[in-house]
Amino acid sequence: MRYLLAVLIAAAFVISSGTSVSTIADDELILSKDTTIGAAVAPTFHDDKRMLQTKAVNGLEEERGWPLLETGIGKIKMGGKKFKHATKRMFGMVSPAGEAKFEAYKGLHKLKRGLIRMYRRVKWWFQKNILRQKHALEEGATRAKHKVSEANQKLKHRTKESEKTAYHRLKEAFQKFRHRMKDFFKKMRVYAY
């Protein structure tokens, strides 16, 4: 029991030192994608993010694994900071300025998480609706294309039918004319004798 406090203090310092270093690195990555500090580490960070994202069947990017992992990491870091702060407060090592700074940090952390969630939801909503509009336009275009091709086929068929009927009528008229001419010349021969 008497070693429990020492173990807790040691664990708190191990967690807090690990979380403070990783918090600085993550903040640099998130805040400065193109700066010289985060440029060396940023590609692996974003590659990991892309690897954890999955593509849905309809083309929407569904971020399944990454937000859960990111949220878990954020909660672990915040838990470490809370534990470190509580340990310092327990031993009376926190000044009023330090308390205010920690409360401001907690508020900023909540605000950042809320903004990230809101950004993801808005992005997903826009992707979903834009994709829906895109699919509707594509379907409309294919329907119009099919209607135009059907109309063209009907027009071709009607044109061929009208050409055939006109040809048959002309042929019949010519045959009638030939028969009349033959009859006329037969009658003329009869009258000639």
UniProtKB/Swiss-Prot annotation:
Question: According to its UniProt record, where is this protein located?
Answer: Secreted; Host membrane
Q: Which residues form the signal peptide?
A: 1-20
UniProt keywords (A-Z) are: Host membrane, Membrane, Secreted, Signal, Virulence
Superkingdom is Eukaryota
Please indicate the residue ranges that the annotation assigns to the motif RxLR-dEER. Answer: 50-64
Q: Which GO terms describe its cellular component?
A: extracellular region; host cell membrane; membrane
Its main subcellular localisation, reduced to a broad class, is secreted
Domain-level remarks: The RxLR-dEER motif acts to carry the protein into the host cell cytoplasm through binding to cell surface phosphatidylinositol-3-phosphate.
The Swiss-Prot or TrEMBL record describes its family as follows: Belongs to the RxLR effector family.
Q: What does this protein do?
A: Secreted effector that completely suppresses the host cell death induced by cell death-inducing proteins.
What protein is this chain from? Answer: Secreted RxLR effector protein 126
Gene assigned in the entry: RXLR126
